Amino acid sequence: MDFNLNDEQELFVAGIRELMASENWEAYFAECDRDSIYPERFVKALAEMGIDSLLIPEEHGGLDAGFVTVAAVWMELGRLGAPTYVLYQLPGGFNTFLREGTQEQIDKIMAFRGTGKQMWNSAITEPGAGSDVGSLKTTYTRKNGKVYLNGSKCFITSSAYTPYIVVMARDGASPDKPVYTEWFVDMSKPGIKVTKLEKLGLRMDSCCEITFDEVELDEKDRFGREGNGFNRVKEEFDHERFLVALTNYGTAMCAFEDAARYANQRVQFGETIGRFQLIQEKFAHMAIKLNAMKNMLLEAAWKADNGTITSGDAAMCKYFCANAAFEVVDSAMQVLGGVGIAGNHRISRFWRDLRVDRVSGGSDEMQILTLGRAVLKQYR
């Protein structure tokens, strides 16, 4: 495997550097984090560069650039301090609709290309069904030629402002043999109530509880095949976990570089703290973790481009990178000392964000469970 960037990938990465140097984005990110605001202006700038077209097939006007290119872009954005967790729907969100959606649904979502606006997200998790997706209670019921949605969802990302969500629900007419189907829901419909939740981190992307009270849908609002909900979201979970891991790496790399610059400038006892062996030890361990993360992610991206990536690969990336990145940021914060915890340094935001990522997108424990099963399956 050769992970040297080709000319097209180098061009994208150079464009990212140019964009990030064009203004003081950090001040904007700090404001958005403080006020829990989606950084639409920044995402629009990325969309105008074509970031939201990276994985769209050429026949649909996309770049079909592949996952190694996505990885290179994500890593560089993260290294430069960008909150890439707000971008999870950009590389793959359009493709999901091209595969599963009706033409009407596709047209509605594709209209968001190049805008930077939030467009849709999945609504799966419920108060009584987190990792145990099979315990979903939200139902759809057919009556008089219509479909009615009832139930509640929680911890749904981006849902404060997205105009559409794809809701997984079970067939109310089949209680003994659960049938899970997804529905494309316009958030302006009567009977929908959205309650925004506060979070420790990842504050630039909303998190909400949503209730559905006799929300009326049509058969044409079904998303994908009847009863195919589980199969569809399994692929989405793998995709999301890979992107979360990329975000973790980029954030950790940014914290590492911030701390390294500080260690080479901060003077105590007559010399820079970077000359002290205890500080050097921290950087040695941080560098080892960062190198391991990077190689794991690039291998996974290569597998994705070659059609060989598995759920075990995605779980391995998510678990290892979420934990290793948090350890790197925590060590970097220790190097920064009071500057990292009492000032307005961005590392405090990174620390909060990475702690959340060990729960969101699939908890550490679920990644270990998925990975353990995948490993043993190879030897049956």
UniProtKB/Swiss-Prot annotation:
UniProtKB keywords: Cytoplasm, FAD, Flavoprotein, Oxidoreductase
GO cellular component, one term: cytoplasm
Reactions accelerated catalytically: 4-(trimethylamino)butanoyl-CoA + oxidized [electron-transfer flavoprotein] + H(+) = crotonobetainyl-CoA + reduced [electron-transfer flavoprotein]
Biological role stated in the UniProt entry: Catalyzes the reduction of crotonobetainyl-CoA to gamma-butyrobetainyl-CoA.
Pathway: Amine and polyamine metabolism; carnitine metabolism
UniProt similarity note: Belongs to the acyl-CoA dehydrogenase family.
Coiled coil: none
GO molecular function, one term: flavin adenine dinucleotide binding
Subunit structure: Homotetramer.
Enzyme's top EC category: oxidoreductase
Gene3D superfamilies (UniProt xref): Acyl-CoA dehydrogenase/oxidase, N-terminal domain, Butyryl-CoA Dehydrogenase, subunit A, domain 2, Butyryl-CoA Dehydrogenase, subunit A, domain 3
SUPFAM superfamilies listed in its UniProt record: Acyl-CoA dehydrogenase C-terminal domain-like, Acyl-CoA dehydrogenase NM domain-like
EC number: 1.3.8.13
Domain of life: Bacteria
Necessary cofactors: FAD
Any Pfam family: Acyl-CoA_dh_N
Compartment(s) where it occurs, according to its Swiss-Prot or TrEMBL record: Cytoplasm
Intrachain S-S bonds: none
NCBIfam families tied to this protein: PRK03354.1 (NF002885)
Organism: Salmonella arizonae (strain ATCC BAA-731 / CDC346-86 / RSK2980)
Protein name, entry field: Crotonobetainyl-CoA reductase
GO BP field: carnitine metabolic process
